[in-house]
Amino acid sequence: MSDRFEATYLIETPHDVASVAQELAGEQSTATSSRMPGETDALIRDFGARVEHIEALPPAEAPSLPVAHTLGQRVHRARLTLSWPLHNIGDSLPMLLTTLLGNQTGMRRLSGIRLERVAMPQSFIAAQPRPAFGIAGTRRLTGVQGRPLIGSIVKPNIGLAPEQTAAMARQLAEGGVDFIKDDELLANPPYSPVARRAALVLRALDEAAQRTGRRTMYAVNITDGLDEMRRHHDAVVQAGGTCIMVNLNSVGLSALLALRRHSQLPIHGHRAGWAMMTRCPALGMEFQPYQMLHRLAGVDHLHVSGLGGKFWEHADSVLQAAHECLTPLDTQAGAADDRALPVFSGGSTIFDVAPTYQGIGTADLIFASGGGIFGHPDGLAAGCASLRQAWEAAIAGQELRAYAQSRPELAAALARGKPVRKA
């Protein structure tokens, strides 16, 4: 596959699958609704998409989406693999995305199309910027080795003045948190501009570091227009920051690529809006292509949701997403480590630690918790300590309650019990 790239789709149609597959391949390469004079056999051979494989699946009971359909007609499902010559897109990530999920998603004869996996030639992968810091760089900047980074977020997530955000960040840092991030809804509002918030928070973290001996990493949300993001980034650097954050789906691949070229700091990628792209099983994409696109563009940390949290995604899907982040893209000998640090968040507590570790088998992650820290009966420091202790137990293979017998912070968190999830 050195000169071609492949994509695998789940498709659904009331029409002949083989015919629809050929139409889909044509739509995303050389074909129009009818063959044009310039569409020669040679052009199709050199630039056309190919149907590589069709796997028939059990039929659907009814079309998942509106489609030209005769009542009672069988609705076919299939797994379809297409390939394209790499010279169709060159080294362009935006054009890769256009090819993978373009006009074919609106084809009238499809009642469902979902991108499942993408395989790219190593030459394409090597041409992309990919993470500048990744796992090793983040650990170096935080000084955390051998365990996950314990993270949190300042609450309330919006509405605080920079001085209030800084005061809360200082409490978290003095309590032992390794990583603090802005909420995805807080970027550069008039009541808390990036430059002032970053300056005050980072000064507070420096003061906390004088007491703790460790400087907490703060991911400053700089989501904005590209020119503004560059200016925000520079303000964070000037203030002594060690991380920036962007809402990936809001800024797009091109802005992320440009920011990666400009940035001197790790890029923390928030996937706000991801559910819109994946929650419908007949549309959108799986996480494998999503994380590949953003890691190729240079993101260092990537959210994957959490186990037992407040969001819809089930545990197996969350763990698979983390595995994808931790799977190298460039597998050539001597290639730089392009893995991204998966970020578990969204209601994570001590009760999610052991299944998280058992599910991914590594401590290379950020484990972000709000209620698990703020809600501890003995305060922030005890909440942070209880999470570290839960991870110590998981890594050592010890049962949580047994490990808590000599650790009052963990014991108190256990006594509080699991949070009650709303139905």
Swiss-Prot record:
Keywords: Magnesium, Metal-binding. GO terms for molecular function: magnesium ion binding; ribulose-bisphosphate carboxylase activity. InterPro entries: RuBisCO (IPR033966), RuBisCo_large_chain_AS (IPR020878), RuBisCO_lsu_C (IPR000685), RuBisCO_lsu_C_sf (IPR036376), RuBisCO_lsu_fd_N (IPR017443), RuBisCO_lsu_N_sf (IPR036422). Mg(2+) binds at K181, D183, E184. CDD domains: RLP_NonPhot (cd08207). The modification N6-carboxylysine is found at K181. Binds 1 Mg(2+) ion per subunit. GO terms for biological process: carbon fixation. SUPFAM superfamilies: RuBisCo, C-terminal domain, RuBisCO, large subunit, small (N-terminal) domain. Its cofactor is Mg(2+). May be involved in sulfur metabolism and oxidative stress response. Does not show RuBisCO activity. PANTHER family: RIBULOSE BISPHOSPHATE CARBOXYLASE (PTHR42704), RIBULOSE BISPHOSPHATE CARBOXYLASE LARGE CHAIN (PTHR42704:SF17). Belongs to the RuBisCO large chain family. Type IV subfamily. This is Uncharacterized ribulose bisphosphate carboxylase-like protein. It comes from Bordetella bronchiseptica (strain ATCC BAA-588 / NCTC 13252 / RB50).
